[in-house]
Amino acid sequence: MKGKVVAGALMVVLAVFMASPRGARASEPRVIEIHAKRFGFTPDQITLKKGETVKIRLVSEDVTHGFFLRPLKIDEEVSPGQPAEILLTPGQTGTFTTICDHFCGVNHGNMKMTIVVSE
Amino acid sequence: MKKSVDRRSFLKLSGAALGIGVLYQAMPAAQAKGAVGEMFDHMGKQTGERPTPFSFVQLSDAHVGFNGPPDPLGTKAFERAVEMVNALPERPELILFTGDLTHDTEEKDVHAQRMKQFLEISRRLNVPLIKCVPGEHDAGLDGGAMYREFLGESSYSFDHRGVHFVALDNVSRAKPEVGKEQRMWLEKDLARFPKSAPIVVFTHRPLFDLKPDWEWFTSDGDEVMNLLSPYENVTVLYGHIHRDDAHELGHVHHYAARSLIFAFPDPEKAPDKKPVPFDKEHPFRNLGIRLVHENFSGQPLVNAAAIEDVELTAREFSGINGMQQLLKEPEL
């Protein structure tokens, strides 16, 4: 009896082990890396599809920056050495301006990028 | 029994946009009786001073130290504003400076020099009381340390002739936010006042989403307004946007003053947040420098493009006699 239970458990573990990597790969969102450096983002424009989940990986190359976009409910901060990740599924199409909202210096007010969401 | 109040005789707060700033006159009815008089009495007990007439000026965004294409004249507009305020026929009792007193720099010595220059110019104002809040260009890079060194605390409150003034700091956390600690302080600060008390909040950024993608917002502005909205007579004065603006949200009125350095365009019409270009033939045009007629309550200002005349008049809120501002169109 005990042997059957152990064997069953092993089969379950094996099934999970075999199924998970493929399943995870199939559902893993596209990763888009964005670098923040005074006073701009690179790239300065990205295009997403409405309803597609993407992972935005934010990297700061100098100081703390903000990443703010009210219509898509993004309000993130990123500091040097501590990348931030944002899971985003845009629910509306349009062209949106994303700004740095963490004051970072004299040209902070011009630090922005564009996110285009298409059908 | 419904109480009858002469709405125009209750309290009048008129604001005239000078371009260099905004002149306000708070004119409570001298002979207020009944419910209004009781409220004034109550205010008098709370603040030690019964509401009485006075005027004050709002100045904003001098950016001392800035000297670039949108305004190569540096502090000239600020200095002109000081001269104009000193020339007003009726001396204001109070100046409220709503942030960005200086332009930021990473060189601390240079920023300190700019703070000193701001103080030197502002001390020329022949006004007994000057109160400031920081803008992000004053406090965004060092959490407000240098601002506090030169100008004291960045959030505080005081009473003047029965009106409660609240300075809110929505820049020192580097993000456009007031923050939980300051919101808790605000709630406690307001708790001693009746709901009908006249309250003027002055801050740098708008406390609502005016244009978020131009960073014209405060992220926890809604939470701040939730604390303010139970009070029936709240006026919010702010700067940051370098242009006139008037918004009524609920029964709270929000007013922005022009800057003393350069103007930003109308966000509804301009595709980008770029300063209005400098016009060397009319160096102060976009700042709207204007001369103020001696009788600003009834006569138009000279050379004015947009004049605001704001009145606080009596109004009944849930059976309580309170005050409401009415924005009048320019009478030119």
Could you describe each region identified by the protein language model?
Chain B
Residues 303-331:
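C-terminal/domain-terminus segments
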Residues 194-210:
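Short acidic, glycine-rich surface-loop motifs adjacent to enzyme active sites
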Residues 16, 63, 101-102, 137-138, ...:
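Catalytic metal-binding/acid-base residues of hydrolase active sites
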Residues 59-60, 95-99, 130-136, 202-203, ...:
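Active-site neighborhood of phospho(di)ester-bond hydrolases with catalytic His/Asp-centered motifs
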Residues 1-21:
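N-terminal secretory signal peptides and thylakoid transit peptides that target proteins
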Residues 38-48, 106-198, 216-235, 247-258, ...:
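Extended active-site neighborhood of metal-dependent phosphoesterases/phosphodiesterases
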Residues 30-112, 188, 210:
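N-terminal active-site segment of His-dependent metallophosphoesterases
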Residues 22-30:
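Hydrophobic membrane-targeting alpha-helices
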